[in-house]
């Protein structure tokens, strides 16, 4: 059967479209034998060269790394398509010619297959209600795509997923009857303005289609405007509680308190809005960095664009590992398969054809759908739907109607539980406090005339706000988001917020070798040819070693020399010629076996070997950066080494800067039969290309003649891992007088195979990646048989020999891949941090062990036999085709092994699962399609940002922007730092908040005034604490951050040690210091400490209110005491409030009497002259004289008409007496102390060492605490603000006293819990060493 059949032939022949190996909606046709057509492509146009099916997959021997595909696409999708049916092509054609055959196939059946589809709308009651989400949910999933929403729904809620798919299919069918599946291609193309299939859309048409159809975006929840985020800050229960308190204050005409609460809440909402928006923007930028790209054909050129820029009408090039960018119609399929599990739930890959196999089955096989994954082959598609018009977009819209579940991180959920517990306890305590205060008749001495119930409830509300850490989860989310943004600076893009916290408990890193632990920049250094009767051979008589020199990365200039002749002197002389550009003079120094001018048989053999490697590595090209003059390899790095080596044998494209003469691009001489190619994958460990020979029975300089007169017209070149390829080798070459030839008469003996295996082992132990180069001559009959094979595996099996080995061994090539700079140090840091590093590679075991030793993963004390294993050893009977060993045996092996070689993707999964069973938190790297399951199985999937496929990136939690192992370790360190900082500010906030509840409760129980008023509590928690808390989130990493073992995954953020040595001691010390400040402040400013003596400092008169017949108390005389320290006087003074009969109003005299006189009277000696004179005439008519003090008081039996009336001889209700003044001063002391306790706690909580050792490491802390201290000072000295917050200016010594109490708290925090904690840790360390000692001795 034809392997590449045009669609019109399929139609007329009635063949099943799924049968051919490759299917194309042809632009042209070409010769039946797969050779080049007569048409010529213009330079730079798509179709410059044919390419093999799936050739973008990995090259043999490559550790799961995926090649770069940009330039590869340019050669892959040729407009000069081969046809196995016959006819010749005419190059590029207009749309009417290029797709006429496909149009004919569909035109007659279009009307039959496209009946008017019945659109089904949701019946009443079938719709889903939108679910309102919290701020944390919005923020933590702000970068979650609708694709992830669909995937999550498919796994977690299959019923909702099934219903969404059903409803979408009913309204927008995807079967073969869909108009996009059955419409003739030229009509479909015309609809979108596509005029030429080979050249794609013009830029003008792209702009028009983008304007018409919009960007290719799966819309998430629209970014909320700032004003909406601001309003949402007022919807939390705690803020609503504050708003109720503010409204109640205004209703009771407490204008200052009500206005102040509104101002504080508004400022807090503004700050929260700013931080949430900043974090959301940070996550949006991270998400945009992970957005996939795709290759499209526009104006005749293949170009990489962002998926968002794809428009209907675009021709998109598809290859293995791509994520399909939009819904599209297949117009070419080269063994193209996609995985549509995202849409269908079925895990089986779907073969894509040009015609739908079944017109009634959903998801027609000639359509590719957005967000599905290309798992095999290659193809082209014509885009017909983008954005929300794609099938995944429509399904996602249906799912969104079902609401979205919470996406809180485990850390956030834990904090919610912690906050809820603390909040519940705090509310219960506060309710008890309020009840006790009311029952005991609590009255605020600073506001003696205020409603006592309102006062205590308002204070309770303030303390409730402070004690309930409802803002912690949001602050943590913001820290995680901004931490993820900071990780980008270290080249790690965290895609999912939970990974930030998970990184902190990572205990095992499973890393690929190539490109991660090593640079991934292969350099060919050794070539070993295999030849009988060679005049130049090594000691074994069969092989000969050659060296490539100079080896300057991807610089192709150089030669191939006898390895044994490359001593230091020879290398020095060759370098002189190299620097002078005298490449033709290499032979004057040492015979250059890569120079075509040399005609000796050995040179012919060497160049023929490199010719095979060059032809097989067709997907990789060399270029020179004009700005840096650096040589670059575009494609697969393993092939890059071979292409560079081939250039030193003068095979390659002529590139500016490549100064060697005699360069020849042999690809034109050996046309590649694209559809017969077998791409590399990790299970085959080899790849095959098929080429037409320019001359019958000659491959380069190797003669293929045999005694039977067979005519060989083609050859299959097989390149791959030696241990796999050598199993299929039968022949080798023999050197003759005229050149090498295949020795058909004598097969390779087992002894000869063992000699080659010994060479392979020798090179591997030198940390070289070794590839074997072989070929098999093919007749026309062989090529026809290859075409009849059903797939790539069958073609490879045929070429290797169905009944016997058929390959001709040419030689092996060894390439060095140097370790990345810093990898050894990073592995050492992992060891110090208690993180185990495992290397998983597809290389041979000797190569893997050698590299592991180079990077320090295996030390001189390690036994390679015990510490490394070939992954076949993880399977029953050492057969990788069998099942894995039982879990117990696997766990035992994986617990000790550091290096896994010849690993398959399923081995990675087994390794991850075994490590997780052992309690480890595992990070796994990967880059290929087959790595995706292992990445998902790991706790932290790490994809490569450069070499990684879209599939791997989509399955990962983190993408390395530089593909560097060092970046993983840096990300772990950053994750530990972020988690440590979260611990610090959670401890800071919890400790201070709980401390407030403690000293409030003790104050009420001890019959003391409240240490803080309501607004002071709000200021303390919403404004003053905020700045240090933010500064704690910016703390640099602790020195011991990477010297401690990983924390357990389920460890709570506040561990037992944090409670015992952090939170609890501080809450006790803070409560003690604040209460000490309050008690001493009250005593120094009033002479008393408790409420009853404080209230007794004023004398009261009881009047009856006429309208309500109730008693009202009025003050008429007060005395209070203060200890003063001035330049003139130090000691107690007595302050007095009295009713002045001369002025007829209540007056206050501070320092009315030196000393402390509780029983002062008008006759007390030393009384202020002003008072003596005022009372000299006694009390006037209408007032009485107090018999105890001699001061005036209201007349007995006085009645008042309302509560606002003031009886003659008494103070008005709003009068601020000396007792209230002293109480306010004492409370101002405790307020200042509370601020300084919490501010200095921010310094002590940063480290378990002495705080002064890290005092200056975070300038943000100094700024934050300066702001808090400044704001506090302003609250006590600025008029207006003073009255709002019930503070007052204090004498200098009281400021020092209040601040000093804060420093007492600091000293206690430093001298008691920290040394105890360090002592505990030292004992634990000694115990650990003691327990290890017997094991070491044993």
UniProtKB/Swiss-Prot annotation:
What is this protein's gene name? ATP4
Q: What is its EC number?
A: 7.2.2.3
Q: Which Pfam family is one of those matched by this entry? A: Cation_ATPase_N
- UniProt-listed GO biological process terms: intracellular potassium ion homeostasis; intracellular sodium ion homeostasis; potassium ion import across plasma membrane; proton transmembrane transport; sodium ion export across plasma membrane
Membrane found in the keyword field: yes
Q: Where is the composition biased (Basic and acidic residues)?
A: 55-69
Tell me where the transmembrane regions lie. Answer: 229-249, 255-275, 418-438, 456-476, 985-1005, 1068-1088, 1261-1281, 1288-1308
Give the compositionally biased regions (Polar residues): 91-104
Signal sequence coordinates: none
Task: Give the UniProt family note.
Answer: Belongs to the cation transport ATPase (P-type) (TC 3.A.3) family.
What name does the UniProt record give this protein?
P-type sodium-transporting ATPase4
Entry's InterPro entries?
Answer: ATPase_P-typ_cation-transptr_C, ATPase_P-typ_cation-transptr_N, ATPase_P-typ_cyto_dom_N, ATPase_P-typ_P_site, ATPase_P-typ_TM_dom_sf, ATPase_P-typ_transduc_dom_A_sf, Cation_transp_ATPase_P-type, HAD-like_sf
Show the PROSITE patterns listed in the entry. Answer: ATPASE_E1_E2
Where in or outside the cell it occurs: the entry states: Cell membrane
Molecular function terms in GO for this entry?
ATP binding; ATP hydrolysis activity; P-type sodium:potassium-exchanging transporter activity
Catalysis: reaction(s): Na(+)(in) + ATP + H2O = Na(+)(out) + ADP + phosphate + H(+)
**Class in the EC hierarchy, top level:** translocase
GO cellular component entries: plasma membrane
The entry's function note states:
Sodium-exporting ATPase. Required for the extrusion of Na(+) from the parasites to maintain a low cytosolic concentration of Na(+). Required for maintaining the viability of extracellular parasites but not for intracellular growth, egress or invasion. Involved in parasite virulence.
In terms of Gene3D superfamilies, this protein maps to: Calcium-transporting ATPase, cytoplasmic domain N, Calcium-transporting ATPase, cytoplasmic transduction domain A, Calcium-transporting ATPase, transmembrane domain, HAD superfamily/HAD-like
The protein's UniProt keywords, in alphabetical order, are: ATP-binding, Cell membrane, Hydrolase, Ion transport, Membrane, Nucleotide-binding, Sodium, Sodium transport, Translocase, Transmembrane, Transmembrane helix, Transport
Taxonomically, which superkingdom?
Eukaryota
């Amino acid at each position: 059967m034809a392997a590449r059949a045009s669609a019109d032939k399929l139609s007329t022949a009635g063949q099943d479209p799924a049968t051919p190996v490759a299917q194309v909606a042809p632009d042209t046709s070409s010769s039946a034998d797969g050779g080049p057509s007569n048409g010529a492509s213009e330079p730079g146009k798509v179709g410059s060269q044919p390419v093999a099916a799936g050739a973008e997959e990995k090259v043999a021997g490559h550790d799961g790394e995926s090649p770069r595909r940009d330039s590869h696409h340019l050669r892959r999708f040729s407009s000069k398509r081969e046809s196995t049916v016959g006819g010749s092509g005419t190059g590029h054609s207009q749309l009417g010619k290029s797709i006429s055959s496909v149009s004919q196939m569909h035109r007659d059946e279009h009307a039959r297959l496209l009946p008017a589809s019945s659109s089904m709308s949701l019946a009443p009651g079938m719709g889903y209600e939108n679910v309102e989400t919290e701020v944390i949910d919005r923020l933590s999933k702000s970068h979650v795509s609708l694709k992830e929403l669909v995937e999550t729904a498919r796994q977690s809620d299959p019923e909702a997923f099934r219903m969404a798919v059903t409803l979408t299919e009913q309204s927008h069918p995807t079967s073969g009857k869909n108009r996009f599946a059955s419409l003739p291609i030229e009509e479909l193309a015309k609809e979108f303005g596509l005029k030429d299939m080979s050249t794609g859309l013009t830029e003008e048409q792209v702009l028009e289609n983008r304007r018409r159809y919009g960007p290719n975006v799966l819309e998430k929840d629209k970014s909320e405007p700032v004003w909406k985020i601001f309003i949402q800050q007022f919807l939390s229960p705690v803020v609503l509680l504050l708003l109720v308190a503010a409204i109640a204050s205004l209703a009771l005409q407490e204008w200052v308190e009500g206005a102040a609460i509104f101002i504080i809440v508004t400022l807090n909402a503004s700050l929260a809005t700013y931080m949430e928006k900043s974090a959301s923007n940070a996550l949006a930028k991270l998400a945009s960095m992970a957005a996939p790209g795709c290759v499209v054909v526009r104006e005749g050129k293949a170009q990489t664009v962002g998926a968002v820029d794809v428009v209907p009408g675009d021709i998109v090039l598809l290859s293995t590992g791509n994520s399909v960018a939009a819904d599209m119609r297949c117009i070419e399929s080269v063994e193209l398969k996609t995985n549509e599990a995202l849409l269908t739930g079925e895990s089986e890959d779907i073969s894509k054809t040009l015609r739908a196999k079944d017109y009634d089955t959903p998801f027609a096989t000639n359509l590719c759908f957005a967000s599905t994954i290309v798992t095999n082959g290659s193809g082209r598609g014509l885009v017909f739907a983008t954005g929300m018009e794609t099938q995944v977009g429509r399904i996602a819209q249906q799912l969104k109607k079902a609401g979205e579940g919470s996406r809180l991180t485990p850390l956030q959920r834990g904090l919610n539980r912690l906050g809820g517990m603390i909040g519940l306890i705090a509310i219960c305590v506060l309710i008890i406090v309020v009840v006790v205060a009311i029952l005991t008749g609590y009255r605020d001495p600073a506001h003696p005339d205020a409603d006592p119930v309102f006062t205590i409830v308002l204070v309770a509300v303030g303390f409730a706000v402070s004690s309930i850490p409802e803002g912690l989860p949001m602050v943590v989310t913001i820290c995680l988001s901004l931490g993820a943004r900071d990780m980008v600076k270290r080249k790690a893009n965290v895609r999912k917020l939970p990974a930030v916290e998970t990184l902190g408990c990572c205990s095992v890193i499973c890393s690929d070798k190539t490109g991660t632990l090593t640079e991934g920049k292969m350099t060919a250094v050794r070539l070993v040819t295999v030849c009988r009767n060679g005049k130049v051979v090594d000691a074994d008589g069969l092989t000969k070693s050659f060296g490539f020199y100079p080896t300057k990365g991807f610089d192709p200039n150089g030669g191939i020399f006898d390895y044994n002749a490359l001593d230091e002197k020879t290398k020095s002389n060759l370098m002189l010629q190299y620097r002078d550009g005298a490449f033709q003079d290499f032979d004057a120094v040492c015979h250059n076996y890569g120079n075509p001018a040399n005609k000796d048989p050995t040179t012919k053999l060497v160049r023929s070997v490199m010719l095979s490697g060059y032809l097989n590595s067709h997907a990789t090209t060399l270029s020179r950066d004009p700005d840096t003059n650096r040589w670059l390899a575009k494609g697969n790095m393993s092939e890059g080494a071979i292409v560079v080596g081939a250039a030193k044998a003068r095979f390659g494209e002529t590139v500016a800067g490549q100064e060697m003469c005699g360069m020849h691009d042999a690809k034109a001489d050996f046309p590649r039969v694209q559809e017969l190619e077998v791409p590399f994958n990790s299970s085959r460990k080899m790849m095959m290309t098929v080429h037409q020979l320019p001359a019958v029975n000659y491959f380069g300089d190797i003669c293929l003649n045999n005694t039977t007169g067979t005519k060989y017209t083609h050859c299959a070149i097989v390149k791959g891992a030696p241990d796999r390829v050598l199993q299929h080798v039968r022949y080798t070459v023999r050197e003759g007088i005229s050149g090498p030839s295949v020795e058909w008469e004598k097969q390779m003996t087992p002894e000869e195979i063992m000699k080659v295996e010994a060479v392979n082992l020798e090179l591997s132990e030198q940390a070289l990646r070794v590839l074997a180069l072989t070929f098999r001559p093919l007749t026309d009959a062989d090529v026809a048989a290859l075409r009849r094979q059903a797939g790539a595996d069958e073609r490879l099996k045929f070429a290797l020999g169905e009944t016997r080995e058929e390959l001709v061994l040419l030689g092996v090539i060894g390439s060095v891949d140097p370790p990345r700079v810093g990898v050894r140090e990073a592995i050492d840091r992992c060891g110090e941090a208690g993180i185990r590093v495992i290397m998983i590679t597809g290389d041979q075991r000797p190569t893997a062990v050698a590299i592991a030793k180079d990077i320090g993963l295996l030390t001189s004390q390690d036994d390679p036999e015990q510490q490394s294993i070939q992954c076949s050893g993880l399977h029953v009977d050492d057969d990788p085709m069998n099942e894995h060993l039982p879990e117990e045996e696997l766990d035992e092996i994986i617990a000790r092994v550091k290096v896994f070689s010849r690993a398959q993707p399923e081995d990675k999964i087994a390794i991850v699962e075994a490590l997780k069973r052992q309690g480890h938190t595992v990070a796994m790297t990967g880059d290929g399609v087959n790595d995706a399951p292992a990445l998902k199985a790991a706790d932290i999937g790490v994809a490569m940002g450069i070499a990684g496929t879209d599939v791997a990136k989509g399955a990962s939690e983190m993408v390395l922007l530089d593909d560097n192992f060092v970046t993983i370790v840096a990300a772990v360190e950053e994750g530990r730092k972020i988690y440590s900082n979260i611990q610090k500010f959670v401890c800071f906030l919890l400790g201070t908040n709980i401390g407030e509840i403690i000293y409030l409760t003790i104050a009420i129980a001890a019959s003391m005034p409240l240490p803080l008023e309501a607004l002071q509590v709000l200021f303390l928690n919403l404004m003053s604490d905020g700045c240090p808390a933010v500064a704690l989130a910016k703390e640099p990493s602790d020195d011991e951050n990477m010297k401690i073992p990983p924390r357990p995954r389920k460890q709570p953020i506040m561990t037992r040690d944090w409670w015992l040595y952090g939170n609890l001691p501080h809450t006790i010390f803070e409560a003690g210091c604040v209460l000490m400040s309050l008690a001493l402040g009250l005593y120094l400013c009033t002479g008393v400490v408790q409420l009853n003596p404080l209230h007794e400092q004023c004398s009261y008169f009881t009047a009856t209110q006429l309208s309500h017949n109730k008693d009202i108390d009025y003050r008429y005389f007060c005395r209070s005491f203060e200890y003063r320290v001035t330049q003139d006087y130090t000691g107690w003074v007595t302050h007095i409030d009295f009713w002045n009969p001369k002025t007829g109003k209540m007056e206050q005299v501070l320092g009315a009497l030196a000393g402390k006189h509780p029983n002062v009277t008008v006759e007390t000696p030393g009384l202020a002259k002003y008072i003596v004179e005022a009372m000299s005439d006694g009390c006037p008519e209408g007032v009485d004289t107090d018999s105890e003090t001699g001061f005036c008081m209201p007349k007995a039996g006085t009645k008042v008409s309302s509560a606002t009336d003031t009886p003659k001889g008494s103070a008005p209700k709003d009068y601020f007496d000396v007792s209230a003044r002293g109480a306010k001063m004492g409370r101002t002391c405790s307020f200042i102390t509370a601020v300084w306790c919490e501010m200095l706690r921010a310094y002590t909580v940063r480290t378990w060492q002495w705080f002064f050792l890290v005092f200056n490491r975070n300038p943000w802390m100094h700024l934050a605490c300066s702001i808090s201290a400044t704001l506090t000072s302003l609250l006590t000295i600025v008029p207006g603000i003073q009255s709002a917050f019930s503070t007052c200016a204090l004498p200098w010594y009281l400021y020092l006293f209040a601040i000093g109490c804060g420093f007492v708290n600091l000293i206690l925090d430093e001298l008691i819990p920290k040394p105890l904690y360090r002592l505990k840790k030292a004992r634990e360390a000694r115990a650990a060493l003691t327990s290890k000692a017997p094991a070491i001795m044993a």
